[in-house]
Amino acid sequence: MSEAISLTFPDGSVRSYPAGTTGREVAESISKSLAKKAVAIALDGTVRDLSETITDGKIEIVTREDGRALELIRHDAAHVMAEAVQELWPGTQVTIGPVIENGFYYDFAKNEPFTPEDLPKIEKRMKEIIQRNKPFTREIWSREKAKEVFAAKGENYKVELVDAIPEGQDLKIYYQGDWFDLCRGPHMASTGQIGTAFKLMKVAGAYWRGDSNNAMLSRIYGTAWATQEELDNYLHVLAEAEKRDHRRLGREMDLFHFQEEGPGVVFWHGKGWRMFQTLTAYMRRRLANTYQEVNAPQVLDKSLWETSGHWGWYQENMFAVKSAHAFTHPDDKEADQRVFALKPMNCPGHVQIFKHGLKSYREMPVRLAEFGNVHRYEASGALHGLMRVRGFTQDDAHVFCTEEQMAAECLRINDLILSVYEDFGFSEIVVKLSTRPEKRVGSDDLWDRAESVMLEVLKTIEEQSGGRIKTGILPGEGAFYGPKFEYTLKDAIGREWQCGTTQVDFNLPERFGAFYIDQNSEKTQPVMIHRAICGSMERFLGILIENFAGHMPLWFAPLQVVVATITSDADDYGREVAEALREAGMAVETDFRNEKINYKVREHSVTKVPVIIVCGRKEAEERTVNIRRLGSQNQTSMSLEEAITSLVDEATPPDVKRKLAAKKQLA
């Protein structure tokens, strides 16, 4: 070992330290206050314990305010939770406890599973352990010692974990006071640095190693943050998300349901299907005059999926089918035993449509769009309302173009995607370019050209938006068949949703032998661009329901108006009002029940009807209406004609309004 190490600091300065120097000693050499605030170091980008001896490299001192400290806080909190559990319930075995998005969990082997009532007790003991401020210390054990110690403690799951660690790999044991655990680390300096901005969230069951053949363990989920304010904000978002849960709102608004016989497929009710159709009609209008809408078969022979490559790399997510007779009589050689698959994607079908008939460079680009029903197998535990289903509709499109047309087509697609999102009220949008992964098809030269074009497109997107649209690069995250743009939206409560994609494909046209005739009368492979805006229409509707908390814009509401009467002698006028609104194109229902008007208003507010028109004797005599808005205590009285004009204008979709305004300007 050399006598000195050389460390480069973030400001570019370089300092020498004796060999064997720890991260803590480096922090102390800068200032005592920094050493006090330090929780770890990052050496060449890798976070490490303060107590580790370090070597040459680029060093950063990580404090609690550093974003990288959050994972340490959560990791340490998981260890403290495990210690608290074993103090409260001796004999409980600890298994694994990773950091996850927004928190952590730990799985325990306990005779009686935890209940929600146990969580406050565990939290209280965790705070006591944190207050003890015991240092985290690390030891390296041999495999034999680790197995012997854990076996003596009755920690059979830890023994199994030790056996699974590859030979020759160090076994790290982290202590916090007398309590210890098998762990890769790193950890902060002491339990006191965790702070008290944590909360245990829920208990659940989990099979050991995720295998239903293994024992059921008891899992505790928690969350931890650097500050109480961050914790409070997170809990507020969770509470808001629960209120906005599209599954609950779907029931309350009578939009859809799921049932056992059709796991992961949606039963759309009348109102929900109207909303689905409104989205489809809107998207159709946006594609008119630009795309050819096509429809490819839902069931295709296995051979096509073998050619496309899906049968090889996507088979576990596909549904394969035979005729019912072939299924029940697999040995019947006279029966048609061909294997078909429900399409998981629309792209192979679109290549077949492009290939049908000779294409000239003069016809390029060819833009094909489909609202295609696709089916993908998802594990039952992964299904989640409209957000994760097995059968869904993609607003899919594929552009076949020349390499020279690629940039213009990507920009055209981008403009359409951003315009759609803005029509639905999303203003915070991030566009990221995913570049070549290690495993890929196509030459480096082809990737160089494609990425160069897409980088220029990304730059143009940011410039044209005046910086309003944020952009970024995701190195190595592209598909094996080409680079792609990913579009992420931020909703009303700050959650991010990845929706749209624009993906260049060098692979599929080659697999299917697609070509066009170029200017030199030569066969040339087209560039294929996959494009989705909503992605899954079902998921996008789920996002919209949660974003608006069910309070949909009038143009998109599944039921726009309820006409409710105060007394039966206003029913005839109520029918007239409802019919006039229907003739104007509004979605209207009536409520002439013998109930108090406030009861009716409350009931329809629960189902998120945007507009309730109240008609009584006075309104009937004066031919007026009383308008009540969802979420507002205000009431507006106006003539029936004014109400129809106002509501129809408000219920006009934004794209239609733009066209009407453009026509008006030309007149």
Swiss-Prot record:
Similarity annotation: Belongs to the class-II aminoacyl-tRNA synthetase family.
Signal peptide: none
GO CC annotations, alphabetized: cytosol
Family matches, as HAMAP family: Thr_tRNA_synth
MF (Gene Ontology): ATP binding; metal ion binding; threonine-tRNA ligase activity; tRNA binding
Gene3D superfamilies to which the protein is assigned, alphabetical: 3.10.20.30, 3.30.54.20, Anticodon-binding domain (3.40.50.800), Bira Bifunctional Protein, Domain 2 (3.30.930.10), Threonyl-trna Synthetase, Chain A, domain 2 (3.30.980.10)
Record CDD domains: TGS_ThrRS (cd01667), ThrRS_anticodon (cd00860), ThrRS_core (cd00771)
Listed GO biological process terms: threonyl-tRNA aminoacylation
Native source organism of the sequence: Agrobacterium fabrum (strain C58 / ATCC 33970) (Agrobacterium tumefaciens (strain C58))
The UniProt record lists the keyword RNA-binding: yes
Main location: cytoplasm
Name assigned to this protein: Threonine--tRNA ligase
Ranges for region Catalytic: 245-553
Cited InterPro entries: aa-tRNA-synt_IIb, aa-tRNA-synth_II, aa-tRNA-synth_II/BPL/LPL, Anticodon-bd, Anticodon-bd_dom_sf, Beta-grasp_dom_sf, TGS, TGS-like
Gene designation per UniProt: thrS
Reaction(s) this enzyme catalyzes, per UniProt: tRNA(Thr) + L-threonine + ATP = L-threonyl-tRNA(Thr) + AMP + diphosphate + H(+)
